Design a protein with these regions (language model features):
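Glycine-rich acyl-CoA binding loop
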Residues: 88-93
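Conserved GNAT acetyl-CoA-binding A-motif
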Residues: 105-116
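Aromatic-flanked redox-active Cys/Sec active sites in thiol-based oxidoreductases
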Residues: 82, 116-117
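Acetyl-CoA-dependent GNAT
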Residues: 2-78, 83-85, 96-98, 102, ...
Length: 117
């Protein structure tokens, strides 16, 4: 699986959690905002939740979240978005590949369940 070296994931932490990222008004009914994503990451911390800021080069362009689901023997790929200013450039596809690579490298599960809220 080829991954764009300009895309990287950084764990959400005390220095980056306030980065202002959002989707367009039309997309808000379908995508959790940054605050709700962080709340879900906190709520699922016992399920090894992993919340990431997605960077293209050194620019934050989006966020993603997944966590373990032992009852389904899978990772739940719960939240993902690319900021409206950076959509349409293939960054979401590349970042998704990188998240899936992280899951594969972790190796706990062989299955991914997509969550649609």
């Amino acid at each position: 699986m080829k991954v764009n070296k300009k895309i990287r994931l950084e764990d959400v932490n005390e220095k980056n959690w306030r980065i202002p990222l959002s989707v367009s008004e039309a997309q808000r009914a379908y995508v959790a905002d940054r605050v709700n994503m962080l709340a879900r990451a906190y709520a699922y911390r016992d399920a090894r939740s992993r919340a990431y800021i997605i960077f293209h080069e050194d620019i934050p362009v989006g966020m993603g979240l997944y966590y373990d689901c032992p009852t389904l023997d899978a990772y739940i790929f719960s939240e993902f978005f690319i900021d409206e200013r950076y959509q349409g450039r293939g960054l979401g596809e590349e970042a998704t590949r990188l998240v899936l690579t992280r899951m594969h490298e972790d190796g706990k599960y062989r299955k991914v369940v997509l969550c649609c809220i």
